[in-house]
């Protein structure tokens, strides 16, 4: 049987003192298994091998608020905020702002500044310059916004540049933003997606995130909202903080194989392919209630620390890249699409292998 579990100290000792390869380390601790590329495995949910941000990683549960800071402060990224449930006025203000028409803050109040901005937009697309949100104008805005790509809002994303610490707060009726002149405590849904431009990152609590899209979800959640990172499996592994980054690359390669296998197993276990989209992780109602995630970010699943782990030392990222797309498989039971739930620990006192 394969399920003995990797010990990290044992993997490090073997790799440091002999010619053990990462595959040999894995085969020692997980008997009768085979390392394969995901492309060689018939996956029940193949998006994990191809979709850029298929894996949803739980960062916080039942949050009442979060503070999000853009980094680096010297050259902060542009934020793109997609919020479901905006009123037509607030949604039109978001759209006009993203197109450079300057309707004023997104406050849901239709004043002269919003009306004038709307007239300018109507003129730019050949519509009657009524300055009001008529059906023709609203349909045109929604049609154009749909070209922006996947977004929780039918009006497209609100784009904020120049650096910011944004607060997202649940008030019991929904969520609102503050902390920037463009947002003005307008309550809408807590179904929110936040992305940032390439090269930048965001900080939430102790973690920094360079990759993925931040997701807030409140559907089927008992209180507040869950905070999740939708991220590519390889970029997720960059932030997996289970072994010191300076350890031997071969030992770290074994850890990368184990960590990737564990994450893929959890994804396949939780994901419902027919329901999975960029905006919906394809999770059961009970899983949505619990975390809106395929996998957690604490030691009870795998400890995910994000960008600060990625820059802690070159060996870990090299190990992830060296094993890119590879998982541990087993032809027997207790697997997901033959991918094992690869358990591991720091040390077991020498008692793992039969």
Named regions from a protein language model:
Residues 1-104, 109-354:
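Conserved, single-site charged/polar hotspot
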């Amino acid at each position: 049987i394969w399920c003995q579990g990797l010990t990290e100290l044992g993997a490090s000792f073997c790799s440091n003192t002999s010619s053990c390869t990462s595959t040999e380390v894995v085969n020692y601790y997980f008997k009768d298994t085979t390392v394969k590329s995901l492309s060689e495995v018939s996956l029940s949910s193949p998006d994990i091998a191809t979709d850029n941000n298929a894996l949803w990683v739980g960062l916080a549960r039942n949050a009442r608020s979060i503070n999000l800071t853009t980094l680096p402060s010297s050259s902060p990224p542009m934020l793109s905020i997609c919020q479901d449930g905006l009123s037509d006025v607030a949604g039109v203000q978001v759209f006009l702002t993203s197109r450079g028409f300057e309707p004023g803050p997104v406050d849901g109040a239709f004043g002269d500044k919003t009306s004038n901005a709307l007239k300018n937009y109507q003129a730019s697309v050949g519509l009657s310059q009524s300055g009001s949100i008529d059906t023709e104008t609203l349909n045109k805005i929604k049609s154009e916004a749909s070209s922006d790509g996947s977004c929780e809002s039918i009006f497209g994303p609100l784009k904020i540049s120049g650096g910011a610490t944004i607060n997202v707060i649940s008030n019991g009726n929904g969520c609102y933003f503050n902390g920037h002149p463009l947002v003005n405590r307008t309550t809408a849904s807590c179904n929110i997606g936040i992305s940032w431009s390439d090269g930048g990152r965001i900080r939430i609590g102790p973690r920094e995130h360079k990759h993925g899209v931040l997701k807030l979800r409140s559907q089927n959640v008992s209180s507040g909202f869950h905070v999740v990172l939708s991220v590519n499996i390889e970029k997720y592994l960059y932030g997996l903080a289970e072994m010191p980054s300076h350890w031997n690359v071969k030992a770290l390669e074994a850890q990368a194989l184990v960590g990737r296998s564990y994450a893929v197993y959890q994804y396949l276990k939780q994901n419902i392919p027919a329901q999975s989209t960029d905006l919906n992780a394809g999770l059961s109602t009970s899983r949505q209630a619990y975390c809106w995630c395929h996998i957690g970010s604490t030691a009870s699943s795998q400890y995910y620390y994000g960008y600060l782990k990625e820059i802690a030392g070159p060996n870990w990222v090299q190990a992830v890249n060296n094993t890119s797309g590879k998982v541990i498989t087993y032809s027997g039971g207790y697997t997901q699409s033959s991918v094992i739930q690869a358990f591991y620990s720091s040390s077991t006192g020498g008692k793992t292998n039969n």
